[in-house]
């Protein structure tokens, strides 16, 4: 079977990355959104023919005329009808494949409900009639993309952040940490921060605009208190941004206040540990033989790890915790800890890249894939081939 017949599809909360096995980057990346025309626009826009359902990037251009819904929330599919439209768009419009002649590798966040996987595999066989399907945990794929089998993956996308220890290609679900703070929540927090500054932002229509502001201007401070002080006393942090309608707004301390929620989720009223705490606790809960290897291979993955300053901030926080908790303040011991944070430049599409590598290697080994025949004979029991969720 040639690589053109193996589809890789990483459906995230914010974007769908899809392409073919063995490729170096996704063929198509489009926002995971579905829009339906608002009634009042249906009559008035005769010359601009609106289809019944708009998927992906087209939603952004027409967003004032559409009722936009996001089928995936926090990594879990909430609306399977809408997800069907997204997959239709991916397979037929973007990749232009005939599913019945292809195999597909899908991804799933760790600690996702089993129902999510079951419904996914059911749709792939019943609706699209794929020849073979495999579902892999996202974190493991990120490591494959980095050429590792053992490491600690910190994956932060649009809907969910998780920290997953992987040893020899197996993840540990009982030690995996998950936090519902990621890209979408930071954008939404930035909307709040900007409205406190006096810029009225509409939650839905301006959401994309604010996301662009976030991607262009936000960063993580090395020392939050000092940076905040600097922001209050000087104007050195203020940057201007031109909105699509020509207005210019100034963004100051908000640039690092918004992403700070990744490290201190209390800022947006989410209980639990921040990214550094999760990573540290995760490694300390592993058995002692694996800890040092994990400290040396902390791999960042996903779009919300792209903030400038995030790797150095994470390193500082982890060293502080190690010094306090493990070494009880004895600094000599830090020399032995070779903490290394890997931040590959293409980490935004890391899960997809790992999927393309895995699918490329496995495309000809029948024992790897769940075949249509197995699904028809065993039903959902065939999911055991995919290992643990």
UniProtKB/Swiss-Prot annotation:
SUPFAM superfamilies named in the record: Actin-like ATPase domain
Subcellular location: Cytoplasm, Cytoskeleton
Keyword terms of this UniProt record: Actin-binding, ATP-binding, Cytoplasm, Cytoskeleton, Developmental protein, Nucleotide-binding
Any single Pfam family the record assigns to this protein: Actin
GO molecular function: actin binding; ATP binding
InterPro entries in alphabetical order: Actin (IPR004000), ATPase_NBD (IPR043129)
Binding-site residues for ATP, renumbered to this chain: 157-159, 211-215, 302-307
Record-level GO BP terms: Arp2/3 complex-mediated actin nucleation
CDD domains: ASKHA_NBD_Arp2
A GO cellular-component term linked to this record: Arp2/3 protein complex
Transmembrane spans: none
Subunit structure: Component of the Arp2/3 complex.
Family note: Belongs to the actin family. ARP2 subfamily.
Function: Functions as ATP-binding component of the Arp2/3 complex which is involved in regulation of actin polymerization and together with an activating nucleation-promoting factor (NPF) mediates the formation of branched actin networks. Seems to contact the pointed end of the daughter actin filament. Regulates the directionality of cell expansion by regulating the actin organization, and thus the microtubules distribution and the fusion of small vacuoles.
Name listed for the protein in its UniProt record: Actin-related protein 2
Organism for this UniProt entry: Oryza sativa subsp. japonica (Rice)
């Amino acid at each position: 079977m040639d690589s053109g017949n193996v589809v890789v599809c990483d459906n995230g909360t914010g974007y769908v990355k899809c392409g073919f096995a063995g490729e170096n980057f996704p063929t198509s990346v489009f926002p995971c959104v579905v829009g339906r025309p608002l009634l009042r626009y249906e009559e008035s826009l005769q010359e601009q023919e609106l289809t019944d359902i708009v998927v992906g990037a087209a939603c952004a251009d027409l967003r004032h005329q559409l009722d936009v819904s996001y089928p995936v929330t926090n990594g879990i599919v909430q609306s399977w009808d809408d997800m069907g439209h997204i997959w239709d768009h991916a397979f037929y419009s973007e990749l232009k494949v005939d599913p019945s002649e292809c195999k597909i590798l899908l991804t799933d966040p760790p600690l996702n409900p089993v129902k999510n996987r079951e419904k996914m595999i059911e749709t792939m066989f019943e609706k699209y009639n794929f020849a073979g399907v495999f579902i892999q945990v996202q974190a493991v794929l990120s490591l494959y993309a980095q050429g590792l089998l053992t490491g600690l993956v910190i994956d932060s996308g649009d809907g969910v952040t998780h920290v997953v220890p992987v040893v020899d290609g197996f993840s540990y679900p009982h030690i995996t940490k998950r936090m519902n703070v990621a890209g979408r929540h930071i954008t939404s927090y930035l909307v709040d921060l900007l409205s406190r500054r006096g810029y009225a932002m509409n939650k839905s229509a301006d959401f994309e605009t604010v996301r662009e502001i976030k991607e262009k201007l936000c960063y993580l401070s090395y020392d939050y208190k000092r940076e905040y002080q600097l922001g209050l006393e000087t104007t050195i942090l203020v940057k201007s941004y031109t909105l699509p309608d020509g207005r210019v707004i100034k963004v100051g301390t908000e640039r690092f206040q918004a992403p700070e929620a990744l490290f201190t989720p209390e800022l947006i009223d989410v209980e639990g540990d921040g990214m550094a705490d999760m990573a540290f606790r995760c490694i300390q809960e592993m058995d002692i033989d694996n800890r040092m290897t994990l400290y040396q291979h902390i791999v960042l993955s996903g779009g919300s790890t792209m903030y400038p300053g995030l790797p150095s901030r994470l390193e500082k926080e982890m060293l502080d915790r190690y010094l306090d908790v493990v070494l009880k303040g004895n600094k000599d011991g830090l020399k032995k800890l070779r903490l290394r944070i890997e931040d590959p430049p293409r980490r935004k599409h890391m899960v997809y890249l790992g999927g393309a590598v895995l699918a490329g290697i496995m495309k000809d080994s029948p024992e790897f894939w769940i075949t249509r025949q197995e699904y028809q004979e065993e039903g959902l029991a065939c999911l055991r081939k995919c290992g643990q969720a």
